[in-house]
């Protein structure tokens, strides 16, 4: 059986270059730039997902629990949310947070679709990809400027002893392996701690390779480490929106100018 390192190195061109096509960016962009102002009372999660899909025009697929998919999400879970003007992506995540699922659930972009289900279902072997994270800039040793080398620049005249360039005892530099392992610990401690095989999980694996890290895992984990592997298209005539990553949540933030413009339009539309 091929190890993760052998598999990743053998297929480096296929797995490490962006594999996602433009359809992935287009699908997510529809959820970012479509606003939905709807509240829900005891609405099934399936109905909420269907509304988001129809309103945004994106293909949002609920991978529900079934005989062939025992780890899928329970489509009959209900959602209670007050009406609020929010991007469709935020509504999707708010609905997942409000549905009361007994197991963690999330979403990911794959093959031009937004897939919604439990984290377990979205982490099956067929859902996983391998990506390489360059870490050169993170593991460069930082000089100790409080203990500079003695250049012996003082004194003058012939017959001096000359300037040595002593660099201290050499213990100020940590070796590459130590710094790399420290970075791995930081990653698995802060990004989905229960996902990593190193920590007893089953969803993601991370291992060093020279001055990079090989990470194999589902897309919803990969985006927390390296972001999306596709570009988000600009929407003509729209103020650009930003994304804020907060764990497995990706929140859409609307510029203040756009919010004020919408409020002005709403006031103008009210009868006087």
Cite the ranges covered by each PLM segment.
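Bacterial N-terminal signal peptides
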Residues: 1-15
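Outer membrane pore-forming secretion/assembly proteins and partners of Gram-negative envelopes
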Residues: 9, 16, 20-272
């Amino acid at each position: 059986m091929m190890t993760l390192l052998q598999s990743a190195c053998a297929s480096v061109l296929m797995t490490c270059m962006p594999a996602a096509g433009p359809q992935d960016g287009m699908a997510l962009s529809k959820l970012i730039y479509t606003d939905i102002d709807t509240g829900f009372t005891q609405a099934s999660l399936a109905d909420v997902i269907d509304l988001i899909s129809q309103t945004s025009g994106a293909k949002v697929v609920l991978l529900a629990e079934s005989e062939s998919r025992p780890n899928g999400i329970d489509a009959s879970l209900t959602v209670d949310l007050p009406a609020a003007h929010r991007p469709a992506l935020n509504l999707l995540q708010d609905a997942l947070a409000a549905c009361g699922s007994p197991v963690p659930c999330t979403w990911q972009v794959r093959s031009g679709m937004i897939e919604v289900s439990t984290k377990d279902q979205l982490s099956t072997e067929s859902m996983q990809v391998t990506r390489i994270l360059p870490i050169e800039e993170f593991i460069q040793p930082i000089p100790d400027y409080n203990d500079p080398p003695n250049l012996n620049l003082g004194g003058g005249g012939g017959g001096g002893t000359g300037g040595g360039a002593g660099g201290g005892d050499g213990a100020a530099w940590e070796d590459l392996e130590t710094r790399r392992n420290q970075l791995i610990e930081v990653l698995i401690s802060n990004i989905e701690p229960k996902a990593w095989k190193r920590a007893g999980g089953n969803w993601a694996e991370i291992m060093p390779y020279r001055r990079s890290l090989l990470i194999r895992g589902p897309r919803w984990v990969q985006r927390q480490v390296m972001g999306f592997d596709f570009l988000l298209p600009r929407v003509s005539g729209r103020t650009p929106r930003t994304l804020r990553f907060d764990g497995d949540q990706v929140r859409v933030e609307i510029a203040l100018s756009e919010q004020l413009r919408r409020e002005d339009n709403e006031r103008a539309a009210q009868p006087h």
